[in-house]
Amino acid sequence: MSVKLGPAGVPLSCKGRTIVEGMDDIISLGLETMEVQTVRLVSPQHFEQYWQAGVLANKTNFEMNLHGPYYSELLGDKLQRNRSLAKVEAALQTAKTINARHITLHVGHYAETGRGHEANEQVASVFNGIVQRINDIWNDDDEMYPVFPWLSEGTPSKIGIETSGRQELWGSLEEVLEVVNHVEGTIPVLNLAHIHARGHGRLRTSEDYGELFDQVRETIGTKEFYCHFSGVEHRMGNAMHYTQIKKSDLNFEPLAEFIIEEGSWLDMTLISDSPLLEHDAMYMLQNIEKARHKQLERKAREERRKALAAQTSMSTEELQAREAEIAAARAKDALANMEKKVEEKAPAEEPKPKAKETKKQDEKDSNDDLFEVDEDDDDLF
């Protein structure tokens, strides 16, 4: 099992804002990957820092990834499609410069084609062209190898097709899997917040995640997964906006449990899309470690039961039931002791002392009566 975690962009805690400085911070946190955001437009002046990041990634075996233009209309009319493909071209060139292993792309609205086989065929045709283009860029010029050594040592970036989070956008899980299954060189980008929202909150247990990953594996026969994770606010099958993980009904603990208990076959890159970026990436890493410790504790208990069963006439099931009885009895005793301590600590109610009346106080009261007038409290304000 291999799980790499990282943020979508330069960490919030990074003092510098360049990609290389962001990589340094990510590595120092114990994370292993990042996704560079080029969701709107790639400017030529950025290519120097992109190349520096690519060199560093190549030397340190750090996994770089790239998110292409957010606003795409690959199912639109000819003008819309050409504009979108021009942005994609810039992203592909950046991916080469930065040594990106995965490029995440969006499709956009269904447009006039609507849902169905025709739309999927058109998307497949577009992505066939994109895959061919990244291969051409990667093998463009042998003389470039000294500058980009990863071109000769590695393979072209994989083109990722992201699941969408809204009903009017192409990109349901089934649509993405159908296209990926027919276009070599593409992979599904499983945005788990989008899948959860589009499925009206479908990802709640480790079994739900197991069904999802099994569906992908059975459909396209892959063990490699590129995923986005974040909290999400959703309504009526549509993602409204990302939230931090702890403030969402999309919990990470069930996914961590699935990864540790059932995901030994996974090769996963997990990107934090949360507004907290690296903080939630670290939160995910901590939850995976907790799940791993729970698994080790469970296995240790099972081994202990087997050893006891071999020494006694009891079966492992009987020993487990006995352990449950002892644990329940201890919990009951602990609750009783706690209630007893609370009762002992409760202070007895002390009688209130009677006020002493003095001659001076009587005189003061009589003086107050001289100036007493009836007033409504509301009139004071």
State the predicted function of each range:
Residues 1-93, 187, 294-337, 341-344, ...:
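N-terminal pre-domain/capping segments
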Residues 3-9, 34-36, 64-68, 103-105, ...:
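Hydrophobic faces of well-ordered beta-strands that scaffold small-molecule active sites
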Residues 8-12, 37-41, 69-71, 108-110, ...:
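Active-site beta-loop-alpha junctions enriched in small/polar residues
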Residues 16, 75, 114-117, 170-173, ...:
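Gly/Pro-rich active-site loop or hairpin
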Residues 23-30, 45-65, 90-99, 131-137, ...:
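Acidic (Asp/Glu)-rich catalytic clusters
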Residues 47-52, 81-88, 119-125, 173-176, ...:
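Charged helix-capping and loop-helix junction motifs
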Residues 74-189:
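Active-site acidic/histidine proton-transfer and metal-coordination neighborhood
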Residues 278-297:
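C-terminal helical cap(s) of enzyme catalytic domains, especially alpha/beta-barrels
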